[in-house]
């Protein structure tokens, strides 16, 4: 985040490295506010949000006064292809009316609002395929925002991924995030960087596991000596990290 929003103003590479360092502790990402989907939603709100939206949604999100969700993936479409989504938003007067079915919506149980990827143009309408999607901010207490169930994720506890049905969800047009048709671009802005940051988180968790393993090796007594004296154990450590002295 920029310094005016309380961030450090660091670039992409520095943030990627910080994700690796912070991931060494299981609690540091939440402590420092570098946790999905809030961090990704902050980025999108910062780039595409109006000043009113930043005041209403971004600033409380940064302050920890709100939680957010990101709602794009659908049960019948490839989650990695935002152009294939079928959830629609139709303009009626000064409102968007949203209907659709989402799954794997991250942080969906605790969220105060969700950023929802919607199809706002049909196949036969004018416009390039990447300009048919729009992201819309939906407060989770809006009538028709129906959480169906939590979706368990292997190896990931406490993430609150949920399945949601949007049934005639009405929000003001002011909740449109960015210009109409910029939803795909906004998704790529957040998902491209997010994939790298998630990878760096995994690397940080790997280093924590490796360091804990080293600690165990130099303290565990077995068969008349420490594990660090066993050739097989040393070989496994060498294979795992040949560049760091044991």
What are these regions (language model features)?
Residues 77-81, 91, 96:
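Hydrophobic, small-residue-rich alpha-helical packing segments that form membrane-like cores
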Residues 61, 76-80, 104-107, 126-128, ...:
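Short Gly/Pro-enriched turn/cap motifs at secondary-structure boundaries
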Residues 14, 140-151, 159-195, 209-231:
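A glycine-rich, basic-preceded beta-loop-alpha segment at the flavin cofactor/substrate interface
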Residues 238-246:
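Single conserved hydrophobic/aromatic residue that forms the stacking wall/gate
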Residues 86, 95, 99-147:
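A short core secondary-structure module
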Residues 64-73, 117:
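A short, Trp-centered hydrophobic/proline-enriched beta-strand micro-motif
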């Amino acid at each position: 985040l920029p310094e005016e929003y309380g961030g450090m103003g660091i670039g992409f590479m520095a943030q990627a490295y910080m994700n690796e360092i912070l991931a060494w502790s299981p609690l540091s990402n939440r402590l420092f506010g570098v946790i999905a989907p809030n961090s990704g939603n902050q980025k999108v709100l910062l780039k595409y949000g109006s000043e009113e939206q930043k005041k209403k949604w971004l600033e409380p999100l940064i302050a920890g006064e709100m939680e957010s969700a990101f709602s794009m993936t659908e049960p019948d479409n490839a989650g990695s292809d935002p152009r294939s989504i079928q959830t629609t938003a139709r303009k009626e007067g000064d409102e968007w009316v949203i209907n659709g079915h989402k799954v794997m919506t991250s942080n969906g149980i605790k969220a105060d609002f969700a950023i929802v990827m919607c199809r706002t143009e049909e196949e036969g309408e004018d416009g390039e395929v990447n300009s048919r999607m729009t992201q819309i901010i939906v407060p989770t207490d809006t009538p028709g925002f129906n959480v169906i169930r939590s979706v368990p994720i292997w190896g990931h506890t406490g993430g609150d991924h949920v399945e949601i049905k949007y049934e005639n969800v009405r929000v003001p047009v002011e909740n449109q995030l960015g210009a109409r048709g910029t939803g795909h671009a906004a998704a790529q802005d957040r998902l491209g960087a997010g994939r790298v940051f998630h990878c760096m988180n995994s690397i940080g968790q790997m280093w924590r596991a490796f360091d804990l393993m080293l600690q165990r090796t130099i303290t565990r007594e077995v068969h008349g000596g420490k594990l660090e004296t066993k050739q097989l154990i040393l070989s496994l450590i060498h294979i795992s990290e040949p560049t760091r002295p044991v």
